[in-house]
């Protein structure tokens, strides 16, 4: 399985940070601070780093889904003069140290915006590209040679998703491929519609074409969801997928057999 954990992020002329490094824990990180202190800045800098992984795909992830540095991300500073002009500091750079691939090797790379209205570039080579191209080749063969390839989980969950589902109306017919989940995965308004439709399709195809025998992928996803809620579930409770609910197919099944969609449960 490929490991991909961000270990360090360094911001140089990125928004309000002139030169700041953050060392991250591989399991969980919590940023606390007042409004405007830079919490979201660090999260979106991590998004720029994750964009480097998506940029390594040449076939299966279109470049429009890669999160880049924007011109407005460059740090602004006021010149001490009679007219107090606001200048843009450059270059704007996000550097990263990360654990990568099955050997858990440490890699480093940086993404740079050199000038206003320019394009985000790599400060050197993308160290993930060779491995990703090998994955794409195995996927393209369509001969199960990619069976042992377990792709990294990459997802940005911004608070913007709470009031607007940016890809709710995304329409895609046919069976979703294993890389389709990377589409919109770094969007600030990313929703769960694609994931829910993938689960729904797995079950429907199993009924229609596999004599009702559930695919292993469906069982693994359901196990993973239950594992995530393990400490919160009471005896006899479990998480199920139920397509009877339009907006939310994840539901809680109580020990008495009552099925409650997640949208009916309180945030507490």
Predicted regions and their residues:
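P-loop NTPase switch/coupling surface
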Residues: 1-194, 212, 216, 230-235
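GG-anchored amphipathic helix commonly corresponding to the ABC/SMC/Rad50 NBD signature/C-loop
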Residues: 49, 267-268
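Extended helical coiled-coil dimerization/tether regions that scaffold
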Residues: 2, 99, 181-267
């Amino acid at each position: 399985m490929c490991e991909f954990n961000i270990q360090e992020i360094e911001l140089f002329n990125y928004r309000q940070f002139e030169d700041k490094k953050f060392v991250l824990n591989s399991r969980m990180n919590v940023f606390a601070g007042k409004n405007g202190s830079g919490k979201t800045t660090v999260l979106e800098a991590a998004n720029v780093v994750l964009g480097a992984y998506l940029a390594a795909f040449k076939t299966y992830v279109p470049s429009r889904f890669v999160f880049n540095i924007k011109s407005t991300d460059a740090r602004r500073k006021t010149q001490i003069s009679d007219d107090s002009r606001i200048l843009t500091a450059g270059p704007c750079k996000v550097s990263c140290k990360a654990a990568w691939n099955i050997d858990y090797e440490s890699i480093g790379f940086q993404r740079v915006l050199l000038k206003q209205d320019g394009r985000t570039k790599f400060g050197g080579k993308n160290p993930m590209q060779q491995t990703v191209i090998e994955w794409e080749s195995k996927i393209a063969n369509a001969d199960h040679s990619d069976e042992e390839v377990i792709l990294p989980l990459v997802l940005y969950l911004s608070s913007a998703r709470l009031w607007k589902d940016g890809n709710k109306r995304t329409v895609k017919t046919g069976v979703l491929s294993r890389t389709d989940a990377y589409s919109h995965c770094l969007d600030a308004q990313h929703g769960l519609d694609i994931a829910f439709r993938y689960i729904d399709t797995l079950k429907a195809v199993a009924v229609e074409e596999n004599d009702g025998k559930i695919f292993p992928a469906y069982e693994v996803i359901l196990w993973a969801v239950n594992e995530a809620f393990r400490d919160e579930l009471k005896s006899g409770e479990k998480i199920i997928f139920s397509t009877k609910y339009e907006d939310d197919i994840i539901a809680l099944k109580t020990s008495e057999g009552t099925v409650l969609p997640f949208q009916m449960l309180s945030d507490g």
